Amino acid sequence: MLQQAQTTSRNTLLDRVDSPKDIRQLTHDDLIILAAEIREKIIDTVSKTGGHLAPSLGVVELTLALHYVFNTPTDKLVWDVGHQSYAHKILTGRRKQFDTLRQYRGMSGFPKRGESDYDAFETGHSSTSISAALGMTLAMDLLQQDNKAIAVIGDGSMTAGMAFEALNHAGHLDKNLIVILNDNEMSISPNVGALSSFLSRKLTGKTMRRVKSHLVEKLQDSDVGENILNVLRKSEESFKSFFTPGMLFEAFKFDYIGPIDGHDIDALISTLNTVRDTAKGPALIHVLTKKGKGYLPAEENPDAFHGVGPFNRQTGKIIKKKGPASYTTVFGQTMLELGKKNKNIVAISAAMVAGTGLTPFSEAYPDRFFDVGIAEQHAITFAAGLASQGMRPVVAIYSSFYQRAMDQIIHDVCIPNLPVTLAIDRAGVVGDDGPTHHGIFDISFLRFIPNLTIMAPKDEAELQQMLVTATGHDGPTAIRYPRGAGEDVSTSQEIESIPILEIGRGELLREGDDILLLPIGNRVYPAMRAAEELAKQGISASVINPRFIKPLDAELICQQAKKTGRIITIEDNTLCSGFGSAVLELLSQKSLYGIKTKILGHPHAFVEHGPQKTLWENSGITSRGIIMAALDLLQKETDPSVANE
């Protein structure tokens, strides 16, 4: 059950909308007013909770028109990525809960089937909507149900190959699938690539007449040309299709309609009604929208307001917490310095330039920076190609998005043992975006790959060391680091002063006799604090910073394991096949069967959204959780409140 926020009653149109049935009774003027009230609700809420503001503001009229025309939830709406679904949530019975958006145990920021029948398909990653809606369309056809499935996909998501695989299949099946192309010329960062340039070709009437006149003149010079002209004269639209985006989608056997003003409710409703009632086969409606529509700061800087924390709604100024630099910032600064020292280093992003900290590198070395769009598979193999010719590519992608490129990592990078560095940002739980964005599987799905070295820094200084080590290593490497601030340790501004790490060598931070704490990455400092508290209770703990998930420092770990007879591993990753599993495998290989062990990490489940600290506490990987696990392993009791994260 969602928490229901306490809200003050207001006499607005929005207060009278509890389901899409209510908006179908409204007049044109009412819909205009309602759109403004929805924007007000979204801006007011997101300014407090944070969230995906600009994408949701851009599709308010489109959302109203879709629910006005289609019989949802019987007709199925599939929102690609899902970060633009706020108006959809407000209109489908969740208005009173909207103030709990992205709050712990509150409303998800993405479509959730368990949250509402109107959320037909769960999304969070890009480019899945057309495939899902096509599957729904086929299922309805097989079940003899006369309903529609509508995919709403942004032009940014159309840069991914999966979208075109679905278009190709849909054209072959020739079913009544409806695709809405929400074209705002943005994914998160501004769109890149030939497709984006193609979609942006909107010829004026004057330009069209000039092109047509010139083409007619040339074609009239031959019999073949005259035959072509006869065909073109049959339809002005056919002529225009040579020069507009429609030709691309018509090649996939879609009926193309558009471009249409995505903020003109009348035009949207009229077009959707026509397509719903007359389409025979797949149809694509090209809708032009403005990301951030209705809130000037978001319109002027849609990248900054794509996914935003709390902000001052009057000024648009983002409320930033004071504290240490983030791991992402340190990564970006170090990449900038590495690029200065080594001309063979190139950086690759998948439509997340600012999010991965690569903006400074992209500005300083534009010829060595590549934003490939939402195309993680291509990013990895593109990097492999660069590496095969002597370059040192660093690919910066969020942990949860690396899942999309598993085959490329294995087949194109690790089998040929190429020097590609995988910078795994947002490793571990990320907070309010929830299970589609948590990075709690990367240790598990990367650890089994031969040739791949995997590292995790305990702090921002060690991140620098690992990045320098990785870019100089003759083989594939991965560095996983978390979302958020570092440990406020000093970092180096000079690459030459950053030490290169010995592959597979950890460090003994504290030596004890009773128990070995073996944390990885961002769990090292909580483990050190736990060891200090345990010492106050007479328990002597060793603490190792492994640095390397693969290969493990077998000598150091086994030496301390034999000495203490007890091990607790701690990781910001799922328990299944993670770092703890690797340690157990090591003990088995070394025939150390008498060691008592306890593995701490996230459960074998999809972790819901919530503050990072809360999620760490729930999984027992804070200082307090480590202390409790140690006492349990030692079969002692004490006050559990002795330490907190």
Curated annotation (Swiss-Prot):
Give UniProt keywords alphabetically. Isoprene biosynthesis, Magnesium, Metal-binding, Thiamine biosynthesis, Thiamine pyrophosphate, Transferase
Entry superkingdom: Bacteria
Q: What is its EC number?
A: 2.2.1.7
Protein name as annotated: 1-deoxy-D-xylulose-5-phosphate synthase
HAMAP family according to UniProt: DXP_synth (MF_00315)
Per its UniProt record, what SMART domains does this chain match? Transket_pyr
Q: How is the cofactor bound?
A: Binds 1 Mg(2+) ion per subunit. Binds 1 thiamine pyrophosphate per subunit.
Which catalytic reaction applies to this protein? D-glyceraldehyde 3-phosphate + pyruvate + H(+) = 1-deoxy-D-xylulose 5-phosphate + CO2
- Which GO biological process annotations does it have? 1-deoxy-D-xylulose 5-phosphate biosynthetic process; isopentenyl diphosphate biosynthetic process, methylerythritol 4-phosphate pathway; terpenoid biosynthetic process; thiamine biosynthetic process
Function (record text): Catalyzes the acyloin condensation reaction between C atoms 2 and 3 of pyruvate and glyceraldehyde 3-phosphate to yield 1-deoxy-D-xylulose-5-phosphate (DXP).
Annotated positions binding thiamine diphosphate: 83, 124-126, 156-157, 184, 295, 376
What the record says about family reads: Belongs to the transketolase family. DXPS subfamily.
Residues spanning the signal sequence: none
Q: Which CDD domains match?
A: TPP_DXS (cd02007), TPP_PYR_DXS_TK_like (cd07033)
**Essential cofactor(s):** Mg(2+); thiamine diphosphate
Stored PROSITE patterns: TRANSKETOLASE_1, TRANSKETOLASE_2
For this UniProt entry, the molecular function terms from Gene Ontology, in alphabetical order, are: 1-deoxy-D-xylulose-5-phosphate synthase activity; magnesium ion binding; thiamine pyrophosphate binding
Q: Which InterPro entries match?
A: Dxylulose-5-P_synthase, THDP-binding, Transketo_C/PFOR_II, Transketolase-like_Pyr-bd, Transketolase_BS, Transketolase_C, Transketolase_CS
Give me the Gene Ontology terms describing cellular component: cytosol
Pathway named in the protein's UniProt entry: Metabolic intermediate biosynthesis; 1-deoxy-D-xylulose 5-phosphate biosynthesis; 1-deoxy-D-xylulose 5-phosphate from D-glyceraldehyde 3-phosphate and pyruvate: step 1/1
* Residues that, per the record, bind Mg(2+): 155, 184
| Description of how the protein assembles with itself and partners | Homodimer.
